[in-house]
């Protein structure tokens, strides 16, 4: 995967994460607390400045009280909306 593709994937995941967080009425600070993250982590992920590891995706899903596969699928849907496979 090239750097532009990696960046686009990180941004798509960030949009999916933000949508899931907002659907639950959570602030970034709430998500950080629930997931035991540094307070800057949700912001960095939502803006595509950081790519999540598998473990972080699991923690995020748990904090959002959703299945990790659903969160991941939402990120893939974001990529497809942009015309990326």
What kind of feature is each model-predicted range?
Residues 1-23, 69:
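A short, Lys/Arg-rich alpha-helix, primarily the initiator
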Residues 15-34, 59:
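Short basic helix-loop element that most often maps to the first helix and adjoining turn
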Residues 30, 40, 55:
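Active-site phosphate/pyrophosphate-handling residues
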Residues 49-61:
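Short, basic-rich loop-to-helix N-cap that marks the start of a DNA-contacting helix
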């Amino acid at each position: 995967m090239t750097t532009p593709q990696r960046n686009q994937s990180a941004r798509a995941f960030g949009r999916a994460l933000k949508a899931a967080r907002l659907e639950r009425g959570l602030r970034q600070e709430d998500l950080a607390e629930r997931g035991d993250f540094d307070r800057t982590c949700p912001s960095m992920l939502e803006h595509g400045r950081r790519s999540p590891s598998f473990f972080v995706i699991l923690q995020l899903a748990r904090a959002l009280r959703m299945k990790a596969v659903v969160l991941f699928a939402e990120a893939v849907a974001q990529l497809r909306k942009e015309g990326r496979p």
